[in-house]
């Protein structure tokens, strides 16, 4: 095989991998997210449907041994900080097994993250979401539909997720977060 053929084959393979990721994303969107209840770090149960009553939810499957997962945390924290006052929740769902679950809380604390961490050591919820690798990030709208999803971490994912979250707040949220009130319409004096 010539060098050119090898090069073209590599480009084609890369295209297929990227196209496959995009197809999986499109396939996920508009599906209903599976219901779940998981314990948080304090042992309190958190239920998806209950939280969706308050606003959209970002579900991020991760593990302590996954470096790309940890690289994504500052991006998730930034989005959470921008929208938490408008009801957005972020569930960082650890799929660490029973032997490494004890490291989850310390790692989150060391990173300064304030979003919720849930534990899925048997990976039952991860299986419901068809997680095959981490990180796996899923944005769920208030109706329980998957609005956006991606597997893996790239810096560009942050911008795409931020845009998808913003689209769920057509009236805008960031103004509310910053403490600005919408201007009242002027009366007609009647």
Q: What is each PLM-predicted segment?
A:
Residues 70-111, 121-128:
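Structural microenvironment flanking redox-active thiols in thiol-disulfide oxidoreductases
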Residues 1-5:
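N-terminal secretory signal peptides that target proteins for export/translocation
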Residues 170-190:
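Non-globular targeting/processing and membrane-anchoring segments
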Residues 24-26:
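Boundary at the C-terminal end of the N-terminal hydrophobic targeting segment
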Residues 106-114, 120-166:
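Thiol/disulfide oxidoreductase modules built on the thioredoxin-like
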Residues 55-57, 61-65, 133:
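Short pre-active-site segment immediately N-terminal to redox-active cysteine/selenocysteine motifs
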Residues 9-21:
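Bacterial N-terminal signal peptides
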Residues 36-57:
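A short beta-strand-turn-helix
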């Amino acid at each position: 095989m010539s060098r050119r053929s090898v090069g073209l084959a590599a480009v084609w393979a890369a295209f297929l991998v990227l196209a496959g990721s995009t197809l999986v994303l499109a396939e996920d969107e508009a599906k209903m997210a599976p219901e779940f209840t998981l314990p948080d770090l304090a042992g309190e149960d958190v239920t998806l449907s209950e939280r969706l009553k308050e606003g959209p939810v970002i579900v991020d499957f991760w593990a302590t041994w996954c470096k790309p997962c940890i690289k994504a945390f500052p991006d998730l924290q930034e989005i959470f900080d921008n929208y938490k006052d408008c009801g957005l929740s972020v569930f960082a769902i650890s799929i660490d097994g029973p032997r490494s679950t004890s490291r989850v809380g310390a790692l989150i604390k060391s990173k300064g993250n304030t979003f919720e961490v849930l534990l899925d050591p048997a990976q039952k919820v991860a299986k419901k979401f068809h997680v095959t690798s981490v990180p796996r990030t899923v944005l769920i709208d208030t109706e329980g539909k998957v609005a956006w999803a991606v597997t893996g971490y790239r810096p560009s994912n942050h911008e795409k997720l931020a845009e998808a979250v913003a689209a769920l707040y057509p009236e805008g949220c960031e103004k509310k977060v910053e403490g600005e009130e919408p201007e009242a319409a002027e009366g007609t004096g009647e």
